[in-house]
Amino acid sequence: MLRRAGVLEDVRRAGFVPKNWSFRKADGTPIVTIEDFAPSKSPDATTVLPIDTLGKILWCHALKNDHISVRWGCHVVDVGQDKDSAWVSVRENGGTEKIIKADFVCGCDGAASQVRKSLFGGEFRGKTWTDQMVATNVYYPFDEWGYDDLNTLIDPDDWHIVARLTKDGLWRVSYRQDGSKSLREVLDEHPARFEHLLPGHPKPDDYTILNISPYRLHQRSAEKYRVGRICLAADAAHLCNPWGGLGLTGGFADAIGLSECLIGIHMGRADHSILDKYDEVRRAIYWNFTDPISTSNFMRVSTSDPETILEKDPVMATFARMHEDSKIREDFDRVCSHPNIFVDLASLSQHIYGILHDFTQYYSTGKGQASL
């Protein structure tokens, strides 16, 4: 998807390809390690890059396109439409309200989307998990404690993730916190949580935190992703917990699919009904793939007994057998190298659903080659 958008080379230069992925007990003891999980030799290898840096890269590319304008400081108040156009009512810095009109409005305004609320009110089908997650970016020498680039720590009470973010030693540590805790309580308890969870049991002077962000975990989807000339995509359309990275990936897939539909309409190769297909397909992918897979990933980390997980969890058992079974390893590399598929890792060679979908197949003159 990033290659198609023309930004992959910049992303690769700014980020890095991670090496090993380890599943561990809460105290850091390894359970199983997947070496070179990216895999590094694939042209579609996993690349790690902080989201704020990715945003800057995308913004710089947008500025080079004469057909794109970026307006800062605009708060969406409402949306509307008639048979010929759609519009967004925004409040600019200073309080001035303005109407921005176009052929279509695409609401990509995040989990608290005002576009979605204008269409459906407070309706957002799904659930919120009991636990909350506290995401932090921190400088701490995890390498000295034998941690890999990606570490998933399994425990019903102390589940957390430790992942290298940058080449200069910045790490993401995200950990469980009681969902009933207030922001003040989360911040007050944070030093004790770090001392308990991190290797070496550090004190605040032993690490440098750049930011700390508690947030709730959700599994939710809007009733529709298309209402007339107004469409929803990414977090504005659906939410999932972060285990597996399906939120950001699904958002990219939405953007690719919606752009194909709008390009088809613009080129005269599709009518507006292709947007109904976008709504139908993307919602089906959320409910049939993103929601169950991300839920399964979260349950594996948050409810499993780390002492028995290799015996009871077929996915973890498969990971463990990779060291001895070259066929499983080959299947894993093949799947991870393919940009369009995900698999049930309990049987790595089985494709269960594609998170991408080619909407150019619905063009009236046959399958086209639409580009972003």
UniProtKB/Swiss-Prot annotation:
Pfam families: FAD_binding_3 (PF01494). InterPro entries: FAD-bd (IPR002938), FAD/NAD-bd_sf (IPR036188), RIFMO-like (IPR050641). Pathway: Secondary metabolite biosynthesis. FAD binds at residues 76, 172-174, 215, 235. It is an enzyme of class 1 (oxidoreductase). The keyword Flavoprotein applies. GO terms for molecular function: FAD binding; oxidoreductase activity, acting on paired donors, with incorporation or reduction of molecular oxygen, NAD(P)H as one donor, and incorporation of one atom of oxygen. Terrein shows anticancer activity on various tumors including cervical carcinoma, ovarian cancer, and head and neck cancer. The secondary metabolite acts as angiogenesis inhibitors through the inhibition of angiogenin secretion. Terrein also has anti-inflammatory activity. It shows an alleviative function of age-related inflammation characterized as an anti-oxidant and might therefore be a useful nutraceutical compound for anti-aging. Terrein may enhance osseointegration by decreasing the level of ROS and has a potentially synergistic effect on osteoblast differentiation. Its cofactor is FAD. It comes from the Eukaryota. Its EC number is 1.-.-.-. The keyword Flavoprotein applies. Keywords: FAD, Flavoprotein, Monooxygenase, Oxidoreductase. Belongs to the PheA/TfdB FAD monooxygenase family. FAD-dependent monooxygenase; part of the gene cluster that mediates the biosynthesis of terrein, a fungal metabolite with ecological, antimicrobial, antiproliferative, and antioxidative activities. The first step in the pathway is performed by the polyketide synthase terA that produces 4-hydroxy-6-methylpyranon (4-HMP), orsellinic acid (OA), and 2,3-dehydro-6-hydroxymellein (2,3-dehydro-6-HM) by condensing acetyl-CoA with two, three, or four malonyl-CoA units, respectively. 4-HMP and OA are not pathway intermediates, but are rather shunt or side products. This is FAD-dependent monooxygenase terC. It comes from Aspergillus terreus (strain NIH 2624 / FGSC A1156). The gene is terC.
